[in-house]
Swiss-Prot record:
Protein EC: 3.1.-.-
Gene Ontology CC terms, in alphabetical order: cytoplasm
Taxonomic source organism: Cronobacter sakazakii (strain ATCC BAA-894) (Enterobacter sakazakii)
Cofactor, how bound (note): Binds 1 zinc ion.
GO molecular function, one term: metalloendopeptidase activity
Taxonomic placement: Bacteria, Pseudomonadati, Pseudomonadota, Gammaproteobacteria, Enterobacterales
Known role: Single strand-specific metallo-endoribonuclease involved in late-stage 70S ribosome quality control and in maturation of the 3' terminus of the 16S rRNA.
Chief localisation class: cytoplasm
Protein's UniProt name: Endoribonuclease YbeY
NCBIfam families, sorted: rRNA maturation RNase YbeY
Cell compartment(s), UniProt: Cytoplasm
Keyword check for Cytoplasm: yes
Length: 155
């Protein structure tokens, strides 16, 4: 299986307790090579202000969010392995993990898996799309040794 080329950018003021590059690499490699042979992904870890600005600019949502996915679309006739960018907000991920009573590492992994599937074209707007995407996420999370991230919703 091929490895994803990772460009990790840390733009958080406080970097204490963030997952390391090897963890992000493991999580990306659990997703992307199943769907695409050669890929490059940028993962940018940000604080709430940057997440809020990007979420407002690109989604019209006036708040920070856990993960934003920006797929790269190469111009016609140009073949590039760049899959896109994931922007992950440290504070939102940490808050959600506490609120949902999930291990922090598992929630970080879930955000990478979830965001990567968006880069690959998956979505969860329609119920059938959500069911398919959540099923893939669950399989990958279990393969990584984490619990089903949607177990509370299924109870």
């Amino acid at each position: 299986m091929s490895q994803v080329i990772l460009d990790l950018q840390v733009a958080c003021e406080d970097t204490t307790g963030l997952p390391d590059e090897a963890q992000f690499q493991t999580w990306l490699n659990a997703v992307v090579p199943q769907f695409q042979e050669e890929s490059e992904v940028t993962v940018r870890l940000v604080d709430e202000a940057e997440s809020h600005d990007l979420n407002l600019t690109y989604r019209g949502m006036d708040k920070p969010t856990n993960v934003l996915s920006f797929p790269f679309e190469a111009p016609p006739g140009i073949d590039m392995p760049l899959l896109g960018d994931l922007i992950i907000c440290r504070q939102v991920v940490e808050r959600e993990a506490r609120e949902q009573e999930k291990p922090l590492e598992a929630h970080w992994a879930h955000m990478v898996v979830h965001g990567s599937l968006h880069l690959l074209g998956y979505d969860h707007i329609e119920d059938d799309e959500a069911e398919e995407m959540e099923g893939i996420e669950t399989e990958i999370m279990l393969a990584l040794g984490f619990d089903d991230p949607y177990i509370a919703e299924k109870a």
